[in-house]
A protein has these predicted regions:
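Bacterial Sec-dependent N-terminal signal peptides
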Residues: 1-21
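Catalytic-core signature of thiol
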Residues: 20-214
Length: 214
């Protein structure tokens, strides 16, 4: 026991003596970024991570700091996946998850809303929790998709899914005021973020396709 204690003292002494002072380091280039985001209990990493990147890109391009609402894209993305799921009679991917390109495409199509205007947390809630949303929507989509009624009455199922999403995450505004100026999501994206979707490409690889090919 004494030998173990003595060894511990020696290790601590060595670490202390060789500890470096951070005063020796100089910042040569500081990359600006926005605050850390927390998706909490939601399957929306695809939106939170992508728009953290978009916010940082906007700073790199000389724009002011803007905190984008990642939840703004949940409703249109879910509706798009539901449409595909129903058209394919339930034989497609359907849950709360997605990928970066979906977020970028949604940004190009729907613009952006600041989180201070719409954050997707209903009064009385304190965090993002989409477990019930995901379960309810999947059950609805399976029922509608496999019954065939979704293709006959598209307006009805869309209203049903939108109703669930509105109940849990609220409805995003069509117009809003930000820092004293009125915007739509499209004009906000153009004037306050300034990111062009066409400037960004995604690169990946698959084991069943040749590498280093476009």
């Amino acid at each position: 026991m004494k030998s173990i204690f003595s060894l511990l003292i020696i290790v601590l002494s060595i670490n202390f003596n060789h500890a470096q002072s951070f005063d020796d380091f100089q910042i040569t280039e500081l990359v600006k970024s926005t605050p850390l985001k927390n998706q909490m209990s939601s399957g929306t990493c695809w939106s939170f991570t992508t728009f953290s990147f978009i916010e940082t890109e906007a700073l790199r391009l000389g724009m002011d700091t803007v905190i984008i609402s990642p939840i703004y894209y949940v409703t249109p993305t879910y509706l798009g996946k539901a449409q595909n799921f129903i058209e394919k009679k339930g034989n497609s991917f359907f849950n709360g998850g997605d990928l970066t390109f979906s977020a970028l495409d949604a940004y190009a199509k729907y613009g952006a809303v600041p989180e201070s205007v719409y954050n997707g947390i209903i009064d009385g809630d304190w965090q993002h929790d989409h477990l019930e949303i995901d379960d309810l929507l999947r059950r609805m989509a399976i029922s509608i998709g496999k019954s065939g009624y979704g293709r006959i009455k598209p307006n009805s199922w869309k209203k049903s899914i939108e109703g669930v999403l509105d109940a849990y995450i609220g409805s995003a505004p069509d117009t809003f005021t930000y820092e004293g100026e009125k915007y739509t999501p499209q004009t906000f994206a153009q004037k306050k973020i300034g990111i062009n979707r066409a400037d960004y490409l995604e690169i990946t690889s698959f084991s069943h396709l040749p590498f280093y090919k476009m």
